[in-house]
A protein has these predicted regions:
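Short aromatic-enriched loop/helix-cap "lid" or pocket-rim segments at secondary-structure transitions
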Residues: 7-10, 70-71, 111
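Conserved Nudix-box catalytic region and its N-terminal flanking loop in Nudix hydrolases
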Residues: 1-43, 47
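Active-site-adjacent beta-strand/loop module that shapes the phosphate/pyrophosphate-binding cleft
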Residues: 62-85, 120-124
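NUDIX/MutT-family hydrolases
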Residues: 78, 87-120
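A short coil-to-beta-strand element that immediately follows conserved catalytic motifs
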Residues: 50-61
């Protein structure tokens, strides 16, 4: 359960890209760093819940505006567990649960999360899907 932007709501691990995620790394080409999104997803999951993940895949994206009026682009991904046990970053999260997409419908989730979980299920089963509101 998240404590920050949506206190008391259930969600999935997440965060933001900062220049610290790549600025001190060697560039992959003369001008660019590659796989930054994947590095950030790995870092955020490790920081927030203590798990190592692999095989990160894009699910969908959304745009929102924060309280200060700043536009935010959210890129949702799915991944496979690689190693580790859940250890919560207490400043971010105070509870966790492993649930199916169907079970998630019984939780007070941030809007759209169940729909994203359903999309991830479709992709895991080899079917392409686009976001649609299910509830």
């Amino acid at each position: 359960m998240t404590k920050k932007r949506f206190p008391g709501k259930w969600t999935v691990p997440g965060g933001r890209v900062t220049t610290d995620d790549y600025i001190n790394l060697p560039k992959d080409t003369d001008e660019c760093w590659y796989n930054i999104l994947e590095r950030v997803v790995r870092r955020e999951v490790k920081e927030e819940v203590g798990l190592e993940i692999k095989n990160i895949e894009y699910v969908t994206s959304l745009a929102t505006i924060d309280k200060e009026g700043t536009p935010i682009l959210v890129i949702s991904c799915m991944a496979e567990w690689e190693s580790g046990d859940v250890v919560l970053q207490e400043s971010e999260t105070d509870q966790y649960a492993w649930v199916s997409s169907e079970e998630a419908k019984g939780y007070d989730l941030i809007g759209g999360i169940v729909d994203e979980m359903l999309m991830a299920d479709e992709r895991r089963n080899g079917r392409k899907s686009e976001w649609k509101k299910s509830m």
